[in-house]
From Swiss-Prot:
Keyword Cell cycle annotated: no
InterPro entries (alphabetical): Epimerase_deHydtase, Heptose_epim, NAD(P)-bd_dom_sf
Originating species: Vibrio campbellii (strain ATCC BAA-1116)
Subunit structure: Homopentamer.
Record comment regarding domains: Contains a large N-terminal NADP-binding domain, and a smaller C-terminal substrate-binding domain.
Gene expressing this chain: hldD
Record-given protein name: ADP-L-glycero-D-manno-heptose-6-epimerase
Amino acid sequence: MIIVTGGAGMIGSNIVKALNEAGINDILVVDNLKNGKKFKNLVDLDITDYMDRDDFLTQIMAGDDFGPIEAIFHEGACSATTEWDGKYMMLNNYEYSKELLHYCLDREIPFLYASSAATYGETETFVEEREYEGALNVYGYSKQQFDNYVRRLWKDAEEHGEQLSQITGFRYFNVYGPREDHKGSMASVAFHLNNQINAGENPKLFAGSESFKRDFVYVGDVCKVNLWFLENGVSGIFNCGTGRAESFEEVAKAVVKHHNKGEIQTIPFPDHLKGAYQEFTQADLTKLRAAGCDVEFKTVAEGVAEYLAIQNR
């Protein structure tokens, strides 16, 4: 069995879909369906069982046996970069992750987890080293702290001549694609611009968006990276982006091209995001490629075209 936490979320449900396409359906999805809209992400998927996050965590902490587990994809987290309740964030993204990690280490279960490019902050160098990290919000900090916890475990194991089972962290950059309808304000720019045009409006970007550049990565490619590391058993913390920085304007142009209508308009940059907003991200893929992962990443033009063909059918 494979367990996917956050399996009703955007990345988690796409990982389940990718596993299904690889002929794997012995899957336990763990999530919190308080946001009932997320159920739609599971409707077309083939899974063995579903479990509530709190019930799952209780069983993990009790050391319960789930039977043979091939791997755990840990995608469950509070991913709202605008959430400032630090106690809530650290409990969800840090403490919960530690419990699950040690459960896996004790049983030598491969543990593949979601980190984030939010760990980098305002740097212009996106290399998986501590000197380049400096989160701008508590979400990024929760992910940064868990990465550092994993690093300490590796260091301790090395000093004692021990070999840990697989731990692989993925620093997701700006992920977009199908199954993000439930995310509200946290959904991708492509999602919001598409909705605006479908509502008969012009697509709207924040002022300055022609110079805001992010590494936008298509969720289908993210899943390919996850499955490659499961298959190859490589440990480490790796950037998961395209290696390209493209502007928000490029995303808007791709959405306009899909619809063949709409003129890009600008709106004022919101005060609540000032100082907590990454204006530039670009994954350094040196470490990913050195590990042997040869997944090719779609450009914004390619990814948005595929996404909207699915979204608008």
